[in-house]
Amino acid sequence: MHVPMRWSDMDAYQHINNVAFLGYFETARVDLFFDHPTHDDETGLRRGIVVASHEIAYKRSVEYDAEPLQVQIWVSGIRAAAFTCHYELFDHGQLAVTGSTLLVPVDFALNRPRRLTPEEKVFLNRYLDDGDAA
């Protein structure tokens, strides 16, 4: 997916600040779970998932440009009550940042983590990395 840079993402060193990349990853994740055309609302993921942790690795700096960045997103590590989203962010076709987010489904009424439903696992398997079948 394409993610635009914002002028305010730039820091005093004239490149995109490191914290902005978590926002770009969030944009890709929201698109996958909420806005993606293949999402037919068969899962409860839209009703509650929370971030348990992030990992991010910066491969090269990114300077502000009107051309949007390209973010690839996929899923791995589907477990009973958690899964991981992975990201690769490209600037002008060059890999600039990689990252991952551990996500946990939550029952907000009980304020507790919950297990993934079979339907949610089917949905997540659509975006599973080929080497990580669940």
Named regions from a protein language model:
Residues M1-Q70, S76-A134:
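Terminal targeting signals and extreme-terminal segments of soluble enzymes
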